[in-house]
Regions:
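Ribosome large-subunit tunnel/peptidyl-transferase-proximal elements
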Residues: 2-112, 152
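C-terminal edge-of-domain segments
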Residues: 137-157
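Generic beta-structure capping elements
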Residues: 14, 120, 154-156
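A broad, structure-centric signal for solvent-exposed, well-ordered loop/edge residues
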Residues: 50, 124-129, 138, 149
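Extended, charged amphipathic interaction segments
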Residues: 112-134
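Generic, ordered loop/turn and secondary-structure boundary motif
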Residues: 66-71, 129-132, 143
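Residues at beta-strand starts and edge strands
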Residues: 37, 115, 145-147
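Short, solvent-exposed beta-edge and connector elements
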Residues: 31, 135-136
Length: 157
């Protein structure tokens, strides 16, 4: 019996200063690719503690995430000055990812109060093929797309 090789994941961004940068990623998670992209755009550029607070507020449905790209037929909300929503499932996964990022920073010896999120993206993962049974013995495809989320933070100041 041969040994099975585990997949090797790479990051889509290059690190300018590896000594002051930390990375964390989630691979093949079952969340919406569209809402993952919107949440990643919302936390990019924030300090780590502010990003965690934003995600906690989204989970508690106190603050909304503005929808910038996937906004057709979405209701307008005064809080976001346009379409927005509460992507709770994505926020839960991303909050765990930010806690992992913070632990990586502490292990590396970085000051977590000075961390800013410099890179947050969601990529499409593999597609799981599923089918809905229909009348007269037919079936319609209903595929599920998994998501890869990667986050990088750098120490500023």
């Amino acid at each position: 019996m041969g040994t099975a090789e585990l997949p090797r994941w790479k990051y889509s961004a290059q690190v300018a200063d590896p000594a002051r940068t930390v990375k964390a990623s989630l691979r093949e998670i079952d969340v919406s690719p569209k809402w993952s992209r919107e949440v990643c755009q919302a936390i990019k550029g924030l300090r780590l503690d502010k990003a965690k607070k934003l995600l906690e507020d989204v989970i508690a449905k106190k603050r909304m995430i503005p929808y910038r790209r996937y906004r057709k037929l979405r209701a307008h909300h005064s809080e976001t000055r346009g379409p927005g929503g509460y992507p709770v499932k994505v926020a839960r996964h991303l909050l765990k990812l930010l806690e992992s990022l913070e632990a990586n920073a502490e292990f590396k010896g970085l000051d977590t109060d000075k961390l800013f999120i410099t890179h947050a993206v969601a990529h499409k993962g593999r597609t799981i093929k599923k089918f809905f049974p229909r009348a007269f013995g037919r079936a319609s495809p209903h595929n599920k797309t998994l998501v890869h989320i990667e986050v990088m933070a750098s120490e500023m100041g």
